[in-house]
From Swiss-Prot:
Disulfide partners: C292-C304, C298-C312, C378-C399, C382-C388
Family stated for the protein in its record: Belongs to the protein kinase superfamily. Ser/Thr protein kinase family.
Cytoplasmic side of membrane: 458-814
Membrane topology qualifier: Single-pass type I membrane protein
Species this protein is from: Arabidopsis thaliana
Positions glycosylated per UniProt: N63, N104, N127, N246, N330, N346, N385
Residue intervals of the Bulb-type lectin domain: 35-154
Gene Ontology biological-process entries: recognition of pollen
Sequence ranges assigned to domain EGF-like in this UniProt record: 288-324
Protein known as: G-type lectin S-receptor-like serine/threonine-protein kinase At1g61400
Length: 814
């Protein structure tokens, strides 16, 4: 049945009546029933529907697999959305499989003649029973005579919470009921992530990755979680959390306005609230939403500020425990107190303690509830308790106190609570603040005076500096060993490019524009004109000239010369007739001009150029900005690596280096380089892996989004490879020009290159061997998937990012 649905959908892809035809087909293929009894089991091809027509129970499979599951899904919605699976760990494979109700009220799934693969357990019904699918989506086993519910699916949750279903705990019995993610989007067996609520007072929600906290909601305050600022006073909460006298707590979800809504815990650890709009699923909430949501990202006594990008800070009176770790963007060691507390209860002397209040805070973990009538009493109770480090009086909760490390704290742009932190009085010295204000005022005054004075000198010297600048550039270049480098005059380049006309413009990148030109001797050239706002300064400009002039290889672009005049900086290259690789791979028409054999030749050529840079040249070069737009193609479609402005040269036995100024292109940067500034041969290997998957798929890393969950290119490539469907990643424009084995091998090589740990990636020599031989390949480990922006927009083309030298790592796009 799934195959027929898929076939019909493809045939009616551009027809407005597709959904009607699909629905009509399902009437003839699927036999619907009102209930399951001992006399009437559920077989493959049959469904059990709820009376309101919203849900149905039936058999289903993924990608036309032989493995069949029994599950509940939304009726009439294509593609199928499964909200509960009975046999999530044991699929059936026999076409004679059926779901039956036994005489004792136990619901059992038989795999044909192979026995029972799943059971609801012993229900012990004495008068017979039946199975119904309620309008809420709850599958229930009911005793026929008494009407007593013997078993229900809402007490055995999967990865989805439906309206009226509950997450719960019981203090006395230790029972817990939560959500458990699927292993993958096509494997419903239990995955790595679990959602639970805690039995503390007040309760809070936890998203766990194994046994480790991954995300925390903050304590519950009557109608909202304090760690979710979206739940403000104007928010009509569809949630409730209640406790009964038996020590049980129930977290319930209701959506009165939409029968087709759900909350899902995805295989990659994201909680999504989804509502069906008649055509598609709208995401009304998704978390974790950013790095601040990850549990304990800023460590003890640190807090994460939600900004663009998020960053960690220490509370007033605290300093980073490890400055070096904070500089690299690793904040998990947290902060330590600068001035030791001397607890004297109500003392008013120099050793007295005071409170510093921080607004818009997600309350930290490890809180304790204290009975207080108001905020003033809450503060006094904390002051009288020497172990109390902070307090908060929260509407809907009351007084919370902290005597342990303040962990997993976030500061929102709006919303949140007031957190008061206990400090030594010296941290809030009034006189010290006054001195600071006076010093700032005097400094600003002097700055303004000096500014006006300097402005006068600047105006008289600006023309003089322009002339000096050109001589300085030329002198610097002459001190370098760059034989054969030609120095061009500006008027020569202006004539060659028709004064940099738009008709001569070949493209635009992060450092400026590239123009086609023709010299008087007939030579065709490409001119890279650095923009005045370019981040490529003197160092990068010199770097590119010196490096490229000393490198000679058929797969590297050749620089002919340069031109410096005033503020203008130009690089002159050999002209590449076919421009850059991205103009073919990502263009709907031109991609047809490069079939699979040609793409495979280009892949091997890039690898040879990379091997020359890393191993075979007299200089060892790390490119640091390898991407599709930096691969140029000559008239014979031979690839040439270009743009060496960010390249670094290694000497002797050096194999890696570290920088505090991280510059590169979003999506191509390896994890260790993006977040710690560490680069090596393996950084370029990671970029090559991304580039390889782009060439295979014809999809751009920064724009690709697959399926309802919006999977990235790396995530989709991993899913295809895990399912032995590597050929599914292939660009459809390639048709039958490829060999499936060769494509699958290249997908596996790409995944080996983008592994998280640099040590797991192949070196360049191993990479070229993998591409040119048929030797066995190692199995890749799951890569780190890049997360799309929350507004659904892709970054701009080849967006560059910079991590500046700060104690708080900040990322800027360019």
């Amino acid at each position: 049945m799934d195959f027929l649905f898929l076939l019909l959908e493809r045939k009616n892809k551009h027809m407005g009546k597709k959904r009607v035809v699909l629905l009509w087909l399902s009437i003839f293929i699927s036999f619907s029933s009102a209930e399951i009894t001992e006399e009437s089991p559920l077989s493959i091809g049959q469904t059990l529907s709820s009376s309101n027509g919203v849900y149905e129970l039936g058999f289903f499979s993924f990608n036309n697999s032989q493995n069949q599951y029994v599950g509940i899904s939304f009726k009439g919605i294509i593609p199928r959305v499964v909200v509960w699976v009975a046999n999530r760990e044991k699929p059936v494979t026999d076409s004679a499989a059926n779901l039956v109700i036994s005489s004792n009220g136990s619901l059992q799934l038989f795999n044909g003649k192979h026995g029972v693969v799943w059971s609801s357990g012993k229900a012990l019904a004495s008068n017979g029973s039946r199975v119904e699918l309620l309008d809420s989506g709850n599958l229930v086993v009911i005793e026929k005579v008494s009407g007593r519910t013997l078993w229900e699916s809402f007490e055995h949750l999967g990865d989805t919470l439906l309206p009226h279903s509950t997450i719960m705990y019981n203090v006395h019995t230790g029972e817990k009921r939560g959500l458990t993610s699927w292993k993958s989007y096509t494997d419903p067996s239990p995955g790595d992530f679990v959602v639970l609520i805690t039995p503390q007072v007040p309760s809070q929600g936890f998203l766990m990755r194994g046994s480790t906290p991954y995300f925390r909601s903050g304590p519950w305050a009557k109608t909202k979680f304090t760690g979710l600022p979206q739940m403000d006073e104007s928010y009509t909460s569809p949630f409730s959390l209640t406790q009964d006298v038996n020590g049980s707590g129930y977290y319930s979800y209701f959506d009165r306005d939409n029968k087709r809504s759900r909350i899902r815990l995805t295989p990659d650890g994201s909680m999504k609230a989804l509502r069906y709009n008649g055509m598609d699923w709208d995401t009304t909430y998704e978390g974790p939403a950013n790095s601040c949501d990850i549990y304990g990202v800023c460590g003890p006594f640190g807090f994460c500020v939600i900004s663009v990008p998020p960053k960690c800070k220490c509370f007033k009176g605290f300093i980073p425990k490890s400055i070096e770790e904070w500089k690299t963007g690793n904040w998990t060691s947290g902060c330590v107190r600068r001035s030791e507390l001397h607890c004297q209860g109500n003392s008013t002397g120099k050793d007295a303690n005071v409170f510093h209040t921080v607004p818009n805070i997600k309350p930290p973990d490890f809180y304790e509830y204290a009975d207080s009538v108001d905020a003033e009493e809450c503060q006094q109770n904390c002051l009288n308790n020497c172990s109390c480090l902070a307090f908060a009086y929260i509407p809907g909760i009351g007084c919370l106190m902290w005597s342990k490390d303040l962990m997993d704290t976030v500061q929102f742009a709006a919303g949140g609570e007031l957190l008061s932190i206990r400090l030594a009085r010296s941290e809030l010295d009034v006189n010290k603040r006054k001195k600071t204000i006076i010093a700032i005022t005097v400094s600003l005054t002097l700055f303004v005076i000096l500014g006006f004075t300097a402005f006068g000198f600047w105006r008289r010297r600006v023309e003089q500096n322009a002339l000096i600048s050109e001589d300085a550039w030329r002198n610097d270049l002459q001190t370098q060993d760059v034989p054969g480098l030609e120095y061009f005059e500006m008027n020569t380049i202006q004539t060659a490019t028709n004064n940099f006309s738009l008709s001569n413009k070949l493209g635009h990148g992060g450092f400026g524009s590239v123009y086609k030109g023709k010299l008087q001797d007939g030579r065709e050239i490409a001119v890279k004109r650095l923009s005045s706002s370019s981040e490529q300064g003197k160092q990068e400009f010199m770097n590119e000239i010196v490096l490229i002039s000393k490198l000679q290889h058929r797969n590297l672009v050749r620089v002919l010369g340069c031109c410096v005049e005033g503020t203008e900086k130009l690089l002159i290259y050999e002209f590449m007739k076919n421009k850059s690789l991205d103009t073919f791979v990502f263009d709907s028409k031109k991609r047809l001009e490069i079939d699979w054999p040609k793409r495979f030749d280009i892949i091997q050529g890039i690898a040879r150029g990379l091997l020359y840079l890393h191993r075979d040249s007299r200089l060892r070069i790390i490119h640091r900005d390898l991407k599709v737009s930096n691969i140029l193609l000559d008239e014979k479609m031979n690839p040439k690596i270009s743009d060496f402005g960010l390249a670094r040269m290694f000497h002797g036995t050096e194999y890696q280096d570290k920088t505090r100024r991280v510059v590169g292109t979003l999506g191509y940067m390896s994890p260790e380089y993006a977040w710690a500034g560490v680069f090596s041969e393996k950084s370029d290997i990671y970029s090559f892996g991304v580039l390889l998957l782009e060439i295979i798929s014809g999809e751009k890393i920064s724009r690709f989004s697959y399926g309802e969950e919006g999977k990235t290119l790396l995530a989709y490539a991993w899913e295809c490879w895990c399912g032995a469907r590597g050929v599914n990643l292939l660009d459809q424009a390639l048709g039958d020009s490829c060999h499936p084995y060769e494509v699958g091998r290249c997908v596996q090589i790409g995944l080996l290159c983008v592994q998280y740990q640099p040590a797991d990636r192949p070196n360049t020599l191993e990479l070229l061997s993998m591409l040119t031989t048929t030797s066995d390949l190692p199995l890749p480990k799951q890569p780190t998937f890049v997360v799309h922006t929350r507004d659904g927009k892709s970054p701009s083309n080849d967006s560059m990012i910079t991590v500046n030298e700060m104690t708080e790592s900040v990322i800027h796009g360019r």
